[in-house]
Regions:
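Histidine-centered, transition-metal-coordinating active-site segments
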Residues: 1-80, 84-90, 97-98, 136-291
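His-Asp-centered metal-binding catalytic motifs of divalent-metal-dependent phosphohydrolases/nucleases
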Residues: 94, 98-119, 139, 198
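Short coil/turn segments at secondary-structure boundaries
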Residues: 67-78, 91-92, 106-114, 127-130
Length: 291
């Protein structure tokens, strides 16, 4: 059996929450294109990002530890994949558009330079007389201009909702380009979830990498409420050595704890806010996704 794009969009209408962004309701693309026969818009956007040069280049870009310190530690690429996995899991539980969340997650770090935030700060200083440098702005520039893959338009010609989600990655006024994307409105719920998935991914895996490298010791974390809760859940006492199995258990339970809290809290806020549509979410005076 073959499912056409229209059938997949109809399936979205039947299964996604009313406050989710539905593919068929997209504002479209800057440059008109024929729709795909078998892929909804955001699935198509996701696949365009995966095939970019910028996405492949994330492999050797620093997250925290530079590459020669070991192949265990996260890079921008592995971080991005973990963000996408967490974002998609949350989206599924909340009835959101998984393809849209994952697409924003996959695109959110495309503009990062080498050497992590140190590299970004160095570029910002060097470019201060020319508008500075911001990795969020660069991510948008990559997908709208620099990735030259089509003869009829610059960039990837991604859907409006993907670009809006990238622009409003942290707040509704993240970068100057936000003025093109209804700055008076907050990001749609898929954008809010993508942002929080980023936070959850880097806090958990930075802790994992820090503990494995020895730069963070368990003694430094003793007394922190969440650390104590997670350790108690696996039956580990303060005096015990943190072996690799215990570390993996802790990180796994930490991610599950935070994801569960985010899903339950966001659902609670949605019910209290009585939102019915994606636009209702954007008109709220606060981000409805949270802990």
């Amino acid at each position: 059996m073959i499912y056409t794009r229209q059938q997949l969009e109809e399936y979205e209408s039947q299964t996604l929450a009313s406050y989710a962004v539905h593919s068929k309701d997209s504002k479209g693309r800057l440059h008109p294109e024929e729709e795909a026969d078998f892929r909804p818009r955001f699935q198509r956007d996701r696949e365009r990002i995966l095939h970019t040069t910028a996405f492949r280049r994330l492999e050797y870009k620093t997250q925290v530890f530079i590459n020669h310190e070991g192949d265990y530690y996260r890079t921008r690429l592995t971080h991005t994949l973990e963000v996408a996995q967490i974002g998609r899991s949350i989206a599924r539980s909340l009835g959101l558009n998984e393809d849209l969340v994952e697409t924003i997650c996959l695109a959110h770090d495309l503009g990062h330079p080498p050497f992590g935030h140190s590299g970004e700060n160095a570029l910002a200083r060097l470019m201060k007389d020319f508008g500075g440098f911001n990795h969020n702005s660069q991510s948008l520039r990559i997908v709208t201009v620099l990735e030259a893959r089509y003869p009829d338009f610059p960039g990837l010609n991604l859907s409006w909702e993907v670009l809006e989600g990238m622009v409003k990655h942290e707040t509704d006024y993240d970068i100057t380009e936000a003025k093109q994307f209804n700055p008076e409105l907050r990001g749609h719920l898929e954008a809010q979830i993508a942002n929080l998935a980023d936070d959850l991914a880097y806090t958990s895996h930075d802790l994992d990498d820090g503990l494995r490298s020895g730069m963070i010791t368990p003694n430094q974390l003793d007394g922190i409420a969440l650390w104590e809760i997670i350790n108690e859940s696996i039956g580990r006492r303060r005096s015990e050595t943190l072996d690799s199995l215990s570390r993996h258990q802790i990180i796994r339970r930490l991610i599950n704890f935070e994801v569960t809290d985010l899903i339950q809290s966001t659902d609670r806020y949605l019910r209290r806010s009585n939102v019915k549509t994606a636009l209702d979410v954007q008109k709220l005076p606060f981000n409805v996704a949270g802990f």
